[in-house]
Protein backbone atom coordinates (compact mmCIF):
# COMPACT_ATOMS: atom_id res chain seq x y z
CA UNK A 1 0.00 0.00 0.00
CA UNK A 2 2.84 2.40 0.87
CA UNK A 3 4.46 1.72 -2.51
CA UNK A 4 1.21 2.53 -4.32
CA UNK A 5 0.80 5.79 -2.43
CA UNK A 6 4.42 6.73 -3.09
CA UNK A 7 3.98 6.03 -6.80
CA UNK A 8 0.88 8.22 -6.99
CA UNK A 9 2.51 11.03 -5.01
CA UNK A 10 5.60 10.97 -7.25
CA UNK A 11 3.60 11.91 -10.34
CA UNK A 12 3.30 15.66 -10.90
CA UNK A 13 -0.24 16.74 -11.81
CA UNK A 14 1.01 20.18 -12.78
CA UNK A 15 -0.91 22.17 -10.15
CA UNK A 16 2.26 23.83 -8.81
CA UNK A 17 4.00 24.40 -12.12
CA UNK A 18 4.96 27.80 -13.57
CA UNK A 19 2.38 29.06 -16.06
CA UNK A 20 4.38 28.17 -19.17
CA UNK A 21 4.88 24.59 -18.03
CA UNK A 22 1.29 24.23 -16.86
CA UNK A 23 0.08 25.36 -20.29
CA UNK A 24 2.40 22.83 -21.92
CA UNK A 25 1.12 19.99 -19.71
CA UNK A 26 -2.49 21.05 -20.31
CA UNK A 27 -1.90 20.96 -24.07
CA UNK A 28 -0.27 17.53 -23.92
CA UNK A 29 -3.18 16.10 -21.94
CA UNK A 30 -5.77 17.77 -24.18
CA UNK A 31 -4.24 15.92 -27.13
CA UNK A 32 -4.14 12.68 -25.17
CA UNK A 33 -7.84 13.02 -24.37
CA UNK A 34 -8.67 13.24 -28.08
CA UNK A 35 -9.64 9.75 -29.21
CA UNK A 36 -8.91 10.65 -32.84
CA UNK A 37 -5.19 10.99 -32.15
CA UNK A 38 -3.35 7.70 -32.64
CA UNK A 39 -0.31 7.33 -30.41
CA UNK A 40 2.14 5.40 -32.59
CA UNK A 41 5.00 6.46 -30.33
CA UNK A 42 5.38 6.65 -26.56
CA UNK A 43 5.45 10.08 -24.96
CA UNK A 44 8.83 11.13 -23.61
CA UNK A 45 8.21 11.78 -19.92
CA UNK A 46 11.52 11.83 -18.00
CA UNK A 47 10.10 13.78 -15.06
CA UNK A 48 7.11 11.49 -14.55
CA UNK A 49 4.35 14.05 -15.07
CA UNK A 50 0.80 12.81 -14.75
CA UNK A 51 -0.38 12.09 -18.29
CA UNK A 52 -3.89 11.19 -19.39
CA UNK A 53 -4.39 7.65 -20.81
CA UNK A 54 -1.65 5.10 -21.34
CA UNK A 55 -2.88 3.11 -24.34
CA UNK A 56 0.04 4.07 -26.56
CA UNK A 57 0.61 1.42 -29.21
CA UNK A 58 3.83 -0.34 -30.27
CA UNK A 59 5.88 1.03 -27.37
CA UNK A 60 8.02 -2.08 -27.27
CA UNK A 61 9.00 -1.97 -30.93
CA UNK A 62 9.56 1.80 -30.78
CA UNK A 63 12.09 1.35 -27.99
CA UNK A 64 13.65 -1.55 -29.90
CA UNK A 65 14.12 0.73 -32.90
CA UNK A 66 15.77 3.39 -30.74
CA UNK A 67 18.05 0.76 -29.19
CA UNK A 68 19.01 -0.50 -32.65
CA UNK A 69 20.07 2.99 -33.74
CA UNK A 70 22.11 3.45 -30.57
CA UNK A 71 23.83 0.08 -30.92
CA UNK A 72 24.53 0.10 -34.66
CA UNK A 73 26.04 3.56 -35.23
CA UNK A 74 29.38 4.87 -33.96
CA UNK A 75 28.35 8.03 -32.16
CA UNK A 76 31.94 9.20 -31.89
CA UNK A 77 31.26 10.54 -35.39
CA UNK A 78 27.67 11.68 -34.87
CA UNK A 79 26.82 14.99 -33.20
CA UNK A 80 23.62 15.99 -35.00
CA UNK A 81 20.40 14.17 -35.88
CA UNK A 82 17.37 15.01 -38.01
CA UNK A 83 14.20 12.93 -37.68
CA UNK A 84 11.91 13.45 -40.68
CA UNK A 85 8.31 12.68 -39.81
CA UNK A 86 9.10 12.89 -36.10
CA UNK A 87 5.49 12.47 -34.87
CA UNK A 88 5.62 12.85 -31.06
CA UNK A 89 9.38 13.37 -31.09
CA UNK A 90 10.32 10.19 -29.26
CA UNK A 91 13.36 9.36 -31.40
CA UNK A 92 14.58 12.96 -31.13
CA UNK A 93 14.28 13.00 -27.36
CA UNK A 94 15.75 9.55 -26.75
CA UNK A 95 18.77 10.01 -29.02
CA UNK A 96 19.46 13.49 -27.65
CA UNK A 97 19.30 12.07 -24.14
CA UNK A 98 21.41 8.99 -24.81
CA UNK A 99 24.11 10.56 -26.97
CA UNK A 100 23.97 14.30 -26.13
CA UNK A 101 23.18 15.21 -29.74
CA UNK A 102 21.88 18.38 -31.29
CA UNK A 103 18.61 16.87 -32.50
CA UNK A 104 15.81 18.21 -34.66
CA UNK A 105 12.42 16.77 -35.60
CA UNK A 106 10.47 17.67 -38.73
CA UNK A 107 6.70 17.05 -38.57
CA UNK A 108 3.95 18.20 -40.95
CA UNK A 109 1.07 17.59 -38.52
CA UNK A 110 0.60 20.79 -36.52
CA UNK A 111 -0.89 19.00 -33.50
CA UNK A 112 2.04 16.60 -33.19
CA UNK A 113 4.53 19.39 -33.84
CA UNK A 114 3.01 21.45 -31.01
CA UNK A 115 2.88 18.35 -28.78
CA UNK A 116 6.61 17.79 -29.22
CA UNK A 117 7.41 21.41 -28.45
CA UNK A 118 5.21 21.22 -25.35
CA UNK A 119 7.36 18.32 -24.13
CA UNK A 120 10.44 20.50 -24.62
CA UNK A 121 8.90 23.31 -22.54
CA UNK A 122 7.55 21.01 -19.85
CA UNK A 123 10.88 19.29 -19.26
CA UNK A 124 13.28 22.23 -19.76
CA UNK A 125 15.02 20.37 -22.58
CA UNK A 126 18.01 21.81 -24.39
CA UNK A 127 19.62 21.01 -27.75
CA UNK A 128 16.37 19.73 -29.28
CA UNK A 129 14.02 21.54 -31.64
CA UNK A 130 11.07 20.87 -33.93
CA UNK A 131 9.96 22.42 -37.20
CA UNK A 132 6.50 22.22 -38.75
CA UNK A 133 7.12 21.31 -42.39
CA UNK A 134 5.94 19.05 -45.19
CA UNK A 135 9.03 17.78 -46.94
CA UNK A 136 9.21 18.32 -50.71
CA UNK A 137 12.10 17.92 -53.16
CA UNK A 138 12.59 21.69 -53.15
CA UNK A 139 12.64 21.98 -49.35
CA UNK A 140 14.98 19.00 -49.06
CA UNK A 141 17.59 20.84 -51.12
CA UNK A 142 17.52 23.71 -48.59
CA UNK A 143 18.20 21.50 -45.57
CA UNK A 144 21.53 21.83 -43.77
CA UNK A 145 23.70 18.76 -43.42
CA UNK A 146 23.28 16.41 -40.46
CA UNK A 147 25.53 13.61 -39.30
CA UNK A 148 22.56 11.22 -39.01
CA UNK A 149 19.14 11.44 -40.66
CA UNK A 150 16.18 9.22 -39.80
CA UNK A 151 13.55 8.77 -42.52
CA UNK A 152 11.13 6.38 -40.87
CA UNK A 153 7.77 5.40 -42.36
CA UNK A 154 7.42 8.52 -44.49
CA UNK A 155 8.61 7.36 -47.92
CA UNK A 156 5.46 5.39 -48.79
CA UNK A 157 3.20 8.32 -47.92
CA UNK A 158 5.18 10.60 -50.23
CA UNK A 159 4.96 7.99 -52.99
CA UNK A 160 1.18 7.85 -52.57
CA UNK A 161 0.48 11.58 -52.42
CA UNK A 162 3.27 13.02 -54.59
CA UNK A 163 4.50 10.11 -56.71
CA UNK A 164 7.59 7.92 -56.77
CA UNK A 165 9.68 10.48 -58.64
CA UNK A 166 9.22 13.04 -55.84
CA UNK A 167 10.03 10.47 -53.15
CA UNK A 168 13.08 9.28 -55.08
CA UNK A 169 14.36 12.85 -55.57
CA UNK A 170 14.02 13.47 -51.84
CA UNK A 171 15.94 10.27 -51.08
CA UNK A 172 18.75 11.21 -53.47
CA UNK A 173 19.04 14.68 -51.98
CA UNK A 174 19.05 13.31 -48.43
CA UNK A 175 22.02 11.15 -49.43
CA UNK A 176 24.00 14.37 -49.90
CA UNK A 177 22.77 15.78 -46.58
CA UNK A 178 24.07 13.13 -44.17
CA UNK A 179 26.86 10.72 -43.33
CA UNK A 180 24.59 8.11 -41.74
CA UNK A 181 21.01 7.21 -42.55
CA UNK A 182 18.28 5.05 -41.01
CA UNK A 183 15.31 4.06 -43.16
CA UNK A 184 11.99 2.27 -42.84
CA UNK A 185 8.94 2.36 -45.09
CA UNK A 186 5.58 0.77 -45.67
CA UNK A 187 5.95 -2.20 -48.03
CA UNK A 188 4.02 -3.70 -50.91
CA UNK A 189 3.50 -6.94 -49.00
CA UNK A 190 1.29 -5.02 -46.52
CA UNK A 191 -2.00 -5.43 -48.35
CA UNK A 192 -5.21 -3.45 -48.11
CA UNK A 193 -3.96 0.04 -47.26
CA UNK A 194 -4.58 3.19 -49.26
CA UNK A 195 -0.93 3.31 -50.28
CA UNK A 196 -0.34 -0.42 -50.98
CA UNK A 197 -0.88 -0.41 -54.75
CA UNK A 198 1.36 2.62 -55.15
CA UNK A 199 4.25 0.40 -54.01
CA UNK A 200 3.85 -2.33 -56.62
CA UNK A 201 7.28 -1.37 -58.00
CA UNK A 202 8.71 -3.21 -54.97
CA UNK A 203 7.68 -6.49 -56.57
CA UNK A 204 7.39 -9.80 -54.76
CA UNK A 205 10.08 -9.18 -52.14
CA UNK A 206 9.71 -5.78 -50.50
CA UNK A 207 12.61 -6.33 -48.10
CA UNK A 208 14.96 -7.09 -50.98
CA UNK A 209 13.75 -4.02 -52.87
CA UNK A 210 14.44 -1.76 -49.89
CA UNK A 211 17.94 -3.19 -49.47
CA UNK A 212 18.83 -2.90 -53.16
CA UNK A 213 17.35 0.59 -53.43
CA UNK A 214 19.52 1.92 -50.60
CA UNK A 215 22.62 0.27 -52.06
CA UNK A 216 21.88 1.77 -55.48
CA UNK A 217 21.63 5.21 -53.87
CA UNK A 218 25.20 4.71 -52.65
CA UNK A 219 24.74 3.60 -49.06
CA UNK A 220 26.61 0.84 -47.30
CA UNK A 221 24.23 -1.34 -45.30
CA UNK A 222 25.43 -1.61 -41.70
CA UNK A 223 22.53 -3.54 -40.20
CA UNK A 224 18.98 -4.64 -40.97
CA UNK A 225 16.33 -5.53 -38.40
CA UNK A 226 12.75 -6.53 -39.10
CA UNK A 227 10.16 -4.94 -36.83
CA UNK A 228 6.41 -5.33 -36.66
CA UNK A 229 3.93 -2.48 -36.81
CA UNK A 230 0.43 -1.85 -35.49
CA UNK A 231 -0.95 -2.28 -39.02
CA UNK A 232 -0.38 -5.92 -39.88
CA UNK A 233 1.17 -9.22 -38.84
CA UNK A 234 4.10 -8.62 -41.18
CA UNK A 235 7.35 -6.80 -40.55
CA UNK A 236 9.23 -3.94 -42.15
CA UNK A 237 12.94 -3.63 -42.81
CA UNK A 238 14.64 -1.18 -40.46
CA UNK A 239 17.92 -0.34 -42.16
CA UNK A 240 20.97 1.40 -40.71
CA UNK A 241 23.26 2.81 -43.40
CA UNK A 242 26.47 4.75 -43.87
CA UNK A 243 28.04 6.47 -46.85
CA UNK A 244 30.03 3.85 -48.72
Region roles according to the model:
Residues 77-87:
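Conserved class I S-adenosyl-L-methionine
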Residues 89-93:
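Glycine-rich SAM-binding Motif I of class I
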Residues 150:
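A conserved beta-strand element that flanks and buttresses the S-adenosyl-L-methionine
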Residues 58-77:
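Conserved alpha-helix/loop element of class I SAM-dependent methyltransferases that forms part
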Residues 158-173:
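A short, conserved alpha-helix within the catalytic core of class I
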Residues 177-189:
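Conserved beta-strand signature within the Rossmann-like core of class I S-adenosyl-L-methionine
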Residues 102-107:
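Conserved SAM-binding motif I beta-strand of class I
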Amino acid sequence: MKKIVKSIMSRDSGSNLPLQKKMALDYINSVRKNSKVAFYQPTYNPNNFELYRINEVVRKTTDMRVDTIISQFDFNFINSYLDIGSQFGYFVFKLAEAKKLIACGMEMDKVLYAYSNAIVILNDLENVSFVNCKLTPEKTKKLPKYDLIGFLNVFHHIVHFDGFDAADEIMRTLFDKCNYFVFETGQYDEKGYYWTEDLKFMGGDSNLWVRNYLINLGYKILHIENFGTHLSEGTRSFVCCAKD
